[in-house]
A protein has these predicted regions:
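Accessory terminal and edge-of-domain segments that mediate assembly/interaction
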Residues: 1-106, 112-254
Length: 254
């Protein structure tokens, strides 16, 4: 039933059925339950070539076609796909993957730091502030999305087993990369946000509506900790390969 509001983004219809469903094309595509859906640039395609992954399908958008791979990892099939940046395209692609069989998803990608955290450090978001648009089409308006405890446990188990230090954080998910004003950054820091990225709350909302497991492993890139001197650093490039390796292991633990 639709909840009407003067502000359109705050309107919500809790009916999970839509005029266009993610599997409306009726493709002959049956994906594994486990999936790594990662914001890792060319690392996904590079790894797929390295291990001889099967390209079993494609997600076609107006600007880019995304290969969907299946690999064998420790004796079980895992779906592997590069996630597009931004809440709306990432939510659409993940919803499509779910429509074709994915049920347990781990994502990873970079985040900007609002606190003094070194580059290439691994973080586990446990709550996301919803300053993006896509989540409001999947879950009724609220200030935060809480991450699923089962996913958090699986992520942290793998990190601890490998002796990798991490922190649990609250993240600020925003659509406005160029609208992270000094006053807004300070406000988010006061609220407890340690990092900022562009998809977490949206993907958590997709998972909640569709009844699937989803979690995310973040790693640090640029820094907004000093409001007078933004530092892009090296965009967390040293952690890409390690992040993918960790996500494959996390997926196997689901």
């Amino acid at each position: 039933m639709i909840q009407k509001h003067a502000i359109p983004i705050l309107e919500f219809d809790d009916n999970p059925q839509a005029v266009i469903m993610p599997n409306h094309e009726g493709l002959d595509l049956h994906l594994p339950k486990k999936c790594v859906f990662a914001f890792l640039g060319e690392e996904i395609d590079r790894y797929a070539r390295e291990v001889g992954a099967d390209c079993v399908g494609e997600f076609v958008s107006a600007t880019k076609t995304y290969p969907v791979y299946v690999i064998n990892y420790k004796g079980e099939e895992i779906c592997l796909a590069q996630a597009p940046v931004g809440s709306a395209p990432a939510a659409q692609f993940m919803d499509w993957l779910i429509g074709y069989g994915v049920e347990q998803i781990i994502s990873t990608g970079t985040c900007g730091v609002l606190a003094d955290i070194e580059e290439n450090a691994f973080l586990v978001p446990v709550r996301a502030l919803r300053d993006e648009g896509a989540s409001y089409h999947y879950v009724a308006a609220s200030r935060y999305m809480e991450m699923q405890p089962e996913a958090i446990v699986a992520i942290e188990h793998v990190l601890e087993a490998r002796g990798i230090p991490y922190e649990e954080v609250m993240t600020w998910t925003t659509d406005g990369f160029y609208r992270e004003t000094a006053e807004k950054v300070a406000y988010r820091k006061e609220e407890g946000c340690a990092v900022v990225e562009m998809e977490c709350s949206a993907l958590a909302a997709v998972a909640q509506l569709r009844g699937v497991l989803w979690g995310e492993l973040l790693f640090t890139a640029d820094s907004l900790a000093d409001l007078d001197q933004y530092d892009s650093r090296d965009w967390g490039s040293e952690a890409f390969e390690k992040a993918l390796e960790l996500c494959l292991e996390i997926a196997s633990q689901f």
